[in-house]
Amino acid sequence: VTAKKAILVLLGVVAAAILLSTLSHRVAAERQQDALDAFYATPPDVAAAAPGAVFRREPLPNLQIAGARTYRLLYRTERTDGSAAVSGAIAIVPTAAAPAAGRPVLAWAHGTVGLGRGCAPSRREHPLQSVPWIADAVANGFVVIAPDYAGLGTAGPSEYLIGRAEANDLTNAVRALDNVPDAAP
């Protein structure tokens, strides 16, 4: 009976440790998202800005790609009804000198893992960690731009999977590159 009790106690301790670890990870993830909320807050002057205008830009420290600088952007885009919106994006810019004709751009309309604020690629702790071709694109001189899509990680409804909305977000993300150092196409 003593061995059975010891095993049950041990199983209880292991279950409690797993539960605490899971809760701790969840709390840390929520805190990370809370810390990013100010960056993704919709500026008051969105409607007056041109499509592609960049409201905020900051380095992405957890996205390290050899030969590149990485940025998180908040830029102006449009919803399918023509109203102004904001979207986040990831911009990856080669550090090598730009060719005289400008840099080629690879605009990536990626999939997503959900519709929560933390599912937006530019809000993830380790964005694009399983996308090996990005390093090859950078090595070949491409600027890579990957929009989150309006409403995914930003305020307002998500129009994810609506072709026109994604086209607007992708086109305006490319326009936003005009406001990123050394990235203009």
What is the role of each PLM region?
Residues 160-182:
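Alpha/beta-hydrolase active-site loop
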Residues 93-102, 175-185:
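Gly/Ser-rich "nucleophile elbow"/oxyanion-hole loop immediately N-terminal to the catalytic nucleophile
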Residues 80-86, 92-137:
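Short, surface-exposed "cap/lid" segments of acyl-processing enzymes
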Residues 151-159:
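Glycine-rich "HGGG/HGxG" loop immediately N-terminal to the catalytic nucleophile
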Residues 79, 110-113, 174-181:
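Sec/Tat-exported extracytoplasmic proteins
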Residues 1-13:
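N-terminal export and membrane-targeting signals
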Residues 105, 138-148:
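A fold-wide structural signal in alpha/beta-hydrolase
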Residues 8-9, 17-98:
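Catalytic-loop region of hydrolases
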